């Protein structure tokens, strides 16, 4: 049995942007499935992001520890579209979230022109939730920007425009400081890779990324430069509570997480939940075995990847929005006592 290590994957995907290639190159994905193996398909978001690495980790642990099943991972694209493909039966797993799944079930927002979305949602179940990771608002250590309130006139990478991360970061800034994107500060148009590169090159004042610490982007940045994470002067009040709603929650980013991190005290930010969806029609026994294979072998990950310590069974099986656990996953969570 191989020992799973993710440090090489994180470094590789930061430079190549290819998740599947990164996994194969580091030698941590199981070798090609034999003729009798069941090969399942997973799609996730940009491969350099922590959430994609979490999902690749899941696939890798299952493939390493469950005979007869291999999970192939492809990175890139939007989770909103991946969910539709799970519903159609073209994918077996994808990323999900309470908000996105609720919208898909109702045929609203990005799904308003997708007449089949509510019906397809019935073929999308939940395997587990995990923390998205606190949103990190990073500046260089010598920046005059000390808090989010100081961002007036700044150039910022919030995430790809129109995406969930962009809207989440924009909303947190506006609810805590009153600063409005496009009026009080500029948000550059870039994808994840070019947005990070803009920060490396000093072309933006603030770089935003939600991730479980330690994050590959900040590990890489602090190899050669110093940074600070910033938060709002005040993270309380009615506007903030309204913004957080049911699915987001305040989170703290500790000091001393990175060798070049110059914060003297923890910083307040926010977090949310994302999850791994699974095709409802995938048989219960298979999903049970997959769920069990991951959680029974999670120690293979946490020993080398400190961020994985944020994954826990209670969070994984919690009720969030309309998403229902796949019966196979629910069986495992009941066995270990986290689901009644």
Task: Please give the residue ranges for each predicted region.
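Bilobed "Venus flytrap"/periplasmic-binding protein-like clamshell domains
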Residues: 39-72, 132-201, 302, 315, ...
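Ligand-binding pocket segment of bilobal, Venus flytrap-like solute-binding proteins
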Residues: 91-95, 184-246
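Sec/Tat signal peptide C-region and signal peptidase I cleavage site
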Residues: 17-18, 22-23, 28-35
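Periplasmic-binding protein-like
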Residues: 168, 294-312
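C-terminal lobe and pocket-closing loops
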Residues: 228-289, 332
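Pocket-flanking alpha-helical
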Residues: 54-60, 74-117, 193-199, 213-222
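Bacterial N-terminal signal peptides that target proteins for export
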Residues: 1-23
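A structural signal for short loop-to-beta-strand junctions that line the ligand-binding cleft
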Residues: 115-130, 258-267
């Amino acid at each position: 049995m191989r020992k799973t290590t993710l440090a090489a994957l994180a470094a590789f995907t930061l430079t190549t942007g290819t998740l599947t290639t990164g996994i194969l190159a580091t030698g941590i994905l199981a070798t090609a499935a034999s003729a009798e193996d069941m090969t399942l398909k997973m799609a996730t978001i940009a491969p350099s992001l922590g959430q994609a690495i979490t999902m690749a980790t899941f696939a890798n642990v299952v493939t390493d520890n469950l005979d007869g099943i291999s999970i192939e991972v492809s990175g890139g694209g939007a989770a909103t579209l991946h969910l539709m493909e799970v519903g159609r039966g073209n994918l077996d797993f994808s990323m999900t979230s309470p908000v996105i799944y609720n919208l898909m079930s109702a045929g609203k927002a990005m799904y308003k022109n997708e007449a089949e979305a509510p019906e397809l949602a019935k073929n999308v179940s939940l395997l587990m939730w995990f923390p998205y990771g606190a949103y990190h608002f990073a500046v260089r250590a010598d920046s005059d920007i000390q808090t989010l309130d100081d961002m007036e006139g700044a150039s910022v990478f919030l995430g790809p425009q129109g995406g969930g991360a962009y809207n989440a970061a924009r909303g947190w800034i506006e609810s805590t400081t009153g600063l409005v994107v496009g009026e009080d500060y500029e948000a550059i148009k870039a994808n994840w890779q070019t947005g990070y590169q803009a920060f490396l090159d000093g072309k933006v004042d603030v770089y935003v990324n939600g991730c479980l610490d330690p994050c590959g982007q900040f590990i890489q940045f602090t190899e050669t430069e110093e940074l600070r994470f910033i938060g709002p002067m005040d993270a309380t009040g009615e506007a903030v509570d309204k913004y957080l709603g049911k699915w987001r929650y305040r989170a703290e980013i500790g000091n001393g997480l990175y060798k070049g991190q110059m914060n003297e005290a923890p910083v307040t930010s926010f977090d949310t939940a994302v999850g791994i969806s699974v095709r409802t029609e995938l048989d219960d026994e298979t999903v049970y075995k997959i769920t069990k294979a991951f959680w029974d072998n999670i120690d293979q990950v946490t020993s080398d990847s400190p961020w994985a310590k944020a994954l826990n069974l209670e969070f994984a099986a919690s009720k969030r929005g309309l998403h229902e656990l796949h019966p196979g996953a629910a069986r495992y969570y009941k066995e270990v006592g986290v689901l009644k």
